[in-house]
Amino acid sequence: MYSTTDFRKGLKIEIDGTPFEIVEFQHFKPGKGGAMVRTKLRNLLNDRMVDNTFRSGEKVGRPDMETREMQYLYREGDDLVFMDLTTYEQLHIAEDTTDGKAGFLKEAQQVRVLLYNGKPLDIDLPVSLVLEVTDTEPGAKGDTVSNVTKPATLETGIVIGVPIFVNIGDRVKVDTRTRDYLGRE
């Protein structure tokens, strides 16, 4: 059990059997009565935001969550297949639960998988990845005056905007949270 004094950004709590992540919290004392904690929570099952107010000292549940190191193996229909690195069990995760992160997965890549009551909830990618450009149009020579970008398809199939000087075969660093180009490797 967590008390409201334990609240911090990113803490995962359970309310009425539903897991939430604390996005924002603020302690406040109204003119009358005891102190309160106003929170903004993200439902981890459906990604919806919820506002909730707790009395100071109120207890909330601790969800049965664990993070496991897994290796991405392959795509099977709409599922992504991962292997647990400690037990060697295979785990199927529906692609739509990954919130667009599946586009960054390469075969044999290691990721952390968040499990809630033994069921996969989300995958945790590194903040940045280095991927190879497989398709992009050639840049016009001398067009370096402005900050112009062009679309480029990466080895995993996602398309990002890259500067004009990036060519096919270049390895680029990409921010996995924003899909922004960070530089060449």
From Swiss-Prot:
It is found in: Cytoplasm. GO terms for cellular component: cytoplasm. CDD domains: S1_EF-P_repeat_1, S1_EF-P_repeat_2. Keywords: Cytoplasm, Elongation factor, Protein biosynthesis. Pathway: Protein biosynthesis; polypeptide chain elongation. One of its GO terms (molecular function) is translation elongation factor activity. GO terms for biological process: peptide biosynthetic process. Its main location: cytoplasm. SMART domains: EFP (SM01185), Elong-fact-P_C (SM00841). Gene3D superfamilies: 2.30.30.30, Nucleic acid-binding proteins. Involved in peptide bond synthesis. Stimulates efficient translation and peptide-bond synthesis on native or reconstituted 70S ribosomes in vitro. Probably functions indirectly by altering the affinity of the ribosome for aminoacyl-tRNA, thus increasing their reactivity as acceptors for peptidyl transferase. Belongs to the elongation factor P family. HAMAP family: EF_P. NCBIfam families: efp, PRK00529.1. This is Elongation factor P. It comes from Nitratidesulfovibrio vulgaris (strain DSM 19637 / Miyazaki F). The gene is efp.
